[in-house]
């Protein structure tokens, strides 16, 4: 009985600390450190030495206001967020990036329901081609590398790209299917102006997709990654590319989002 009481008291103490940190504690000067301590404890990261919290997001930030002027992009379905989707604000950022780069060809890795695909189509010229690559459900058992366990449900969907099916803008979209680790990108070499990477979030796949996209992006083109701050495999891979590969030294994390971007 005493053990159960101790557990209950411990739970109440943790709940109190979390509640304070996420409310009144946010007003304090040490709020960021406190949040990082909680984050690191939940993710099994133990700070060393002076117990300074470990911030896993090392890529420099850029302010969204440095990227755009007035928000003139058109949006469709931005309020219909859910698991696996970009947020409303992220979708607006991506839409504005597409408008700013005015691409002739966009290549997307990871179609899912096609919400971002549709909005990129709506915010690009009528002659822009959007190619979107998705792993079919039947390909789950034969991927070249392992995907994250939590991603299986995003692959096992009834329809890929259902958001843009039947939409007038769908005429600009070409769906292709396969595993990005074994897909032949040769047809698209040096022909892509904007690439959006939102496929598997496993470390090896993020490295693979980033490398593959580098072979198809034109000089002056834009690479966009989603979920930099949401999946350990993504931030680990992008941090590594930023620190070790000169080609990726210009990556920036757009503040207030999980988006990272690189002008090639």
For the regions a protein language model found, what residue spans apply to each?
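Membrane-proximal basic amphipathic "stem/tether" segments
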Residues: 1-72
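S-adenosylmethionine/decaboxylated-SAM
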Residues: 77-81, 85-264
């Amino acid at each position: 009985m005493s053990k159960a009481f101790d557990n209950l008291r411990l739970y109440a103490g943790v709940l109190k600390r979390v509640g304070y940190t996420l409310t009144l504690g946010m007003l304090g000067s040490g709020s960021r450190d406190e949040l990082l301590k909680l984050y690191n404890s939940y993710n099994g990261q133990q700070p060393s030495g002076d117990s300074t919290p470990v911030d896993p997001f090392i890529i420099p930030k850029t302010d969204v206001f440095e990227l755009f002027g007035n928000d003139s992009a058109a949006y469709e379905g931005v309020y219909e967020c859910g698991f696996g989707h970009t947020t409303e604000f992220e979708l607006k950022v991506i839409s504005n990036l597409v408008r700013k780069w005015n691409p002739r060809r966009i290549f997307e890795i990871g179609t899912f329901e096609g919400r971002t695909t549709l909005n990129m189509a709506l915010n690009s010229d009528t002659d822009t081609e959007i190619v979107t690559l998705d792993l079919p459900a039947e390909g789950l058992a034969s991927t070249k590398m392992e995907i994250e366990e939590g991603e299986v449900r995003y692959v096992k969907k009834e329809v890929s790209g259902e958001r843009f099916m039947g939409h007038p803008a769908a005429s600009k979209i070409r769906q292709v299917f396969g595993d990005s680790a074994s897909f032949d990108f040769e047809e698209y070499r040096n022909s892509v102006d904007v690439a959006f990477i939102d496929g598997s979030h496993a470390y090896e796949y993020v490295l693979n997709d980033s490398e593959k996209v580098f072979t198809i992006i034109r000089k002056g083109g834009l690479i966009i990654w989603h979920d930099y701050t949401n999946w350990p495999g993504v931030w680990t891979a992008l941090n590594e590319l930023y620190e070790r590969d000169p080609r990726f030294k210009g990556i920036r994390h757009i503040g207030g989002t999980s988006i990272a971007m690189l002008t090639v």
